Amino acid sequence: MRIIVIGATGTIGKAVVEALRGKHEVVQVGHRHGDYQVDLADKGSIERLYEMAAPFDAVVSAAGLAKFGALDGLSDADFQFSLSNKLMGQVNLVRVGMTQIRDNGSFTLTSGVLSQEPTRGSAAISLVNAGLEGFARAAALEMPRGVRINVISPPWVSETLEAMGRDGDAGMPAAQVARAYVESVEGSENGEVIDARAYAY
């Protein structure tokens, strides 16, 4: 399969690329680096990406930014940034790409456990993650030509925690998280929220 991986230079994205590249043709997309570049907050940028990268059998999004902060400190702009980037950016990957993806292709998006297990300061991120999960469940009912859509819900990634100066053992290694993405691409699930923790070993 020819698979577009968005966020390919990020911690999870790099692990997903590594997990897929042995069996598939992987097109690496980043905000500033990679085979192609895309700005998820710009629908026109997404349209241009697909024009350049077509044809393709699957899209994996391991990208998207959202603001973390106390509820009484988050501004309208913080919420709008989160909605425009991680939520609508991934929604538009599907809306624009669903007419161009090959038959029986798949979209794999990324939410996160904060949709179901919020913490203090996660209001904007939890909102976005829950929205993505609801979108995927509903969109799966309308995907054309056998196209599937799933969302991966990863926990904190060990490498990210270590970069923050925290205990990496409290997270899950990116290589293990990547197994959930491979399952979404190569499996038959549709309209599912896949908890990456099920793929820990």
Q: Where in this protein do the model-derived segments appear?
A:
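N-terminal Rossmann NAD(P)H-binding glycine-rich loop of SDR-like oxidoreductase domains
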Residues: 4-19
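Conserved NAD(P)H cofactor-binding loop of Rossmann-fold oxidoreductase domains
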Residues: 60-69
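Substrate-binding pocket helix/loop in short-chain dehydrogenase/reductase
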Residues: 70-71, 78-80
